[in-house]
From Swiss-Prot:
GO terms for molecular function: actin binding; calcidiol binding; vitamin D binding; vitamin transmembrane transporter activity. Expressed in the liver. Found in plasma, ascites, cerebrospinal fluid and urine. Involved in vitamin D transport and storage, scavenging of extracellular G-actin, enhancement of the chemotactic activity of C5 alpha for neutrophils in inflammation and macrophage activation. SMART domains: ALBUMIN. Residues 17-208, 209-394, 395-474 form the Albumin domain. This is Vitamin D-binding protein. It is found in: Secreted. Allele GC*1S is O-glycosylated at Thr-436. The trisaccharide sugar moiety can be modified by the successive removal of neuraminic acid and galactose leaving an O-mceeN-acetyl-galactosamine. This conversion is thought to produce a macrophage-activating factor (Gc-MAF). Only a minor proportion of plasma GC is O-glycosylated. The potential N-glycosylation site predicted at Asn-288 is thought to be nonglycosylated. GO terms for biological process: vitamin D metabolic process; vitamin transport. Residues 1-16 form the signal peptide. It comes from Homo sapiens (Human). Disulfide bonds join 29-75, 74-83, 96-112, 111-122, 145-190, 189-198, 220-266, 265-273, 286-300, 299-311, 335-376, 375-384, 407-453, 452-462. It holds the Pfam family Serum_albumin.
Amino acid sequence: MKRVLVLLLAVAFGHALERGRDYEKNKVCKEFSHLGKEDFTSLSLVLYSRKFPSGTFEQVSQLVKEVVSLTEACCAEGADPDCYDTRTSALSAKSCESNSPFPVHPGTAECCTKEGLERKLCMAALKHQPQEFPTYVEPTNDEICEAFRKDPKEYANQFMWEYSTNYGQAPLSLLVSYTKSYLSMVGSCCTSASPTVCFLKERLQLKHLSLLTTLSNRVCSQYAAYGEKKSRLSNLIKLAQKVPTADLEDVLPLAEDITNILSKCCESASEDCMAKELPEHTVKLCDNLSTKNSKFEDCCQEKTAMDVFVCTYFMPAAQLPELPDVELPTNKDVCDPGNTKVMDKYTFELSRRTHLPEVFLSKVLEPTLKSLGECCDVEDSTTCFNAKGPLLKKELSSFIDKGQELCADYSENTFTEYKKKLAERLKAKLPDATPTELAKLVNKHSDFASNCCSINSPPLYCDSEIDAELKNIL
């Protein structure tokens, strides 16, 4: 766990369990030999907690125990050459039993209909959706030390499991680095003569790594939910809304840059990928946008590159400039092979004119742009555009209007003030509703707004919630 090479092998280990290939077995054995049983177990716990975020501590611990046991046995000198393949196949079969003690993936049942290597590869490919709402709450210093003194090993395992399941989209190397550093702090401070002073000092030292880990989890969760193409669209929308006075030429390279960083770093085994790439990105942000927006300029005055990134990441949408309405691009523009930026231009122009959170705009723009692009594949693209264009424009306008109604007053007010205005609007629309019914509606709508009406709303959760709310809109 102390070197990038080791972490690189750890990623191979994640696949070796399912694949059982000789060359992967050799990597696992080398890893086991280098780390030793204790650190290998810790690394496995982080890896499988991350891979199975819905698994219980007991389920993940049981899987880790089995993996470590088979690795120790099959990597021992004089072990049967078939040991590794036989044991991993048995582990795979055990995962398919109805009373399996191991954590379950969505899709496990389908994988279990397959046999041999095909089953192992199927299980290796299964992924949970990102945990968009981490529930981890750090205990008090006294609670931490009480649990640590009671059973240091059990405390460490529980912490690694809980933290890794909550922040599992952060790169594996970052999770390993942070959890190891955190446990080192606990070990030092809970045996210190002045635990409070010790925790204060050590947390200050850990602040940068903690922030990098949690923020990486957040941006990588969004990337995992959207994929590369839609992430690029999402990043373009956000920047257009934060700095609507900028030009496309200022914003598009930045949207592409952060998308490329996430593509490279979210699954990287290198511990310094995010730590190196994000500061470089903030320099580009400030070079391109600090003169275009006063809030951006303020963010660029922060002391560290990470603080600059956090400031710009959480920056809300700016006030809309007064601009003429934007029209859908023509078939001539869309179908022109030399005009590669036409869809980006439309996305940018619509976004900087529209007071509506990114999750809404990404949801409606992706199918709209795709539908327009499909006209280029038919023989008579002009007729296709003439037929689709007005309908798409009407659907887009209707969706935006409904979305703006759902999020009305949210970003401009405190939450208390927002709920007050929401209650007034609902009362005007539903004069016959009882106070109890109104209160229930206010809570329902405000819960939705608090999760889905800000610039960095969680895309997976909000996708289905937006559908439900639009069906019930008053």
